[in-house]
Amino acid sequence: MENYIDTVAAMGRTVIVTGTGNNGSQPWHAGGILQQGKTEEIQLAVGAFEPTLNVQLWKDYEDEMEIYLESPSGERIGPLYERLGPQRHLLENTELLIYYGKPGPYQLSQEIYIDFIPEGNYVDSGVWKVLLSGKRVRSGQYFLWLPGGNVLNRGTGFYSPRAVGTLTIPSTAGKVISVGAYDSRQNAYADFSGRGSQFLPIRKPDLAAPGVSISAPVPGGGYATVTGTSFAAPFVSGSAALLMEWGIVKGNDPFLYGEKVKAYLRKGAQRVGGYEEYPNAVSYTHLTLPTNSLV
């Protein structure tokens, strides 16, 4: 999807704006740096009455890692080896289906997909463990994902989740303007707002805009107080429209679109409080229309 959006963004006089998602404070993402000869343990809590579950493990394809899986009772399988087709293992009353993916024409990473299928009605609850042992490591970075969108029961999630790297698609596309949310009253980044990572090939998010307790119109008339990056993105799309009107419609700059609009918005942005390094995992800074940059 990112490649398609980047292609569309390069056609005509367009600017594409998207929110970074609201997974920053959720326990659905974990990750780290695995060193050669070392072992990392990732603990996953599975709540009661979880009918199904899957974990996506992403790593650099050139890194060789031994993977072990341990059930709440201490039963363990591994090391797992890469091979074509699904691997089936039974731990307690849960069957594990494991698929090793391959790199593709547009990515260097490898996905290892782990599906938890209960023999009865529910996945065994308790603390599951994923153990990674570095065998032949170059970069060592790895990320684990659980399904988002509130499809999991309360109590299911990683014990040590990471906020960095919680951008949602399509905010990971390079030529879009990816917008995080901040609390304009406190001048503080919103904890739920999706964050970027130093391991991404490009720095994201691009900007932060007000996304906490925003007064917005609702269907049927009236207003309501809303929160989320979906309500931060319109501030930036409106600002982009004003810049394009000034440049294209009013004849001041017929080329004011695409990455040029993004560059102007970045330059005019101000820093969000609480951070010493800019740009960082939360954004370049928060939105301010760059009127001084246009003259």
Sequence positions of predicted segments:
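Conserved small/polar residues in nucleotide/adenosyl-binding loops
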Residues: 285-291
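Conserved, compact domain cores that house catalytic/ligand-binding motifs in diverse enzymes
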Residues: 158-221, 225
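Hydrolase catalytic cores
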Residues: 55, 64-66, 72-73, 211-277
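Short, intrinsically disordered, charge-balanced linker/junction segments flanking boundaries
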Residues: 278-284
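Subtilisin-like serine protease catalytic core
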Residues: 11-13, 51, 62-65, 173-175, ...
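Substrate-binding/access-modulating region of protease and related hydrolase catalytic domains
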Residues: 1-33, 49-79, 83-173, 219-233
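Non-catalytic, beta-strand-enriched accessory regions in extracellular/secretory proteins
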Residues: 35-47
